[in-house]
Amino acid sequence: MKKILLINGPNLNMLGIREPGVYGNDTLSDLESGFAEYAQAHGCEVECFQSNHEGDLVDKIHATHGTCDGIVYNPGAHTHYSYALRDALGSVSTPCVEVHISDVSTREAFRRISVIAPACVAQVKGRGFAGYNDALDILLEGVTERLGEGFEERYMPGQVIVAGRDLIDE
């Protein structure tokens, strides 16, 4: 049975309360239970973790090395500036998919920047809670190539960007 770590970063513990027009009315508990059910139906064991603290998230990512088959990760606001989390993902061989409930590419300018995605094998955005299931599907396909620097210029824009697919012809 594959081991998957579901990580949710800062403020995601406030789902259902914070900006329901953007994130919906369902809670983090709803998200975690729905994802765990989907993962179990696909032969995976899930551990759920949420923290508002960068160092705790770094430690959790480090702990996946050699013990976990994949990470589904919504870094929240850390997406836009946390090089510590990006480096943590880069320091382990565990493939990770970055997920966002809303389509961050259509929101405020600062939300369009991800320093995390280059260390991930894919980015899923704007698919609501279903995006987490999409992320698991990508991990189960065995994608291990990371998006890398400048991925936005090499891949077709969209809600789901997977390393090695949808490359722009040069």
Stretches found by the model and what they are:
Residues E45-G55:
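Short beta->alpha junction loops
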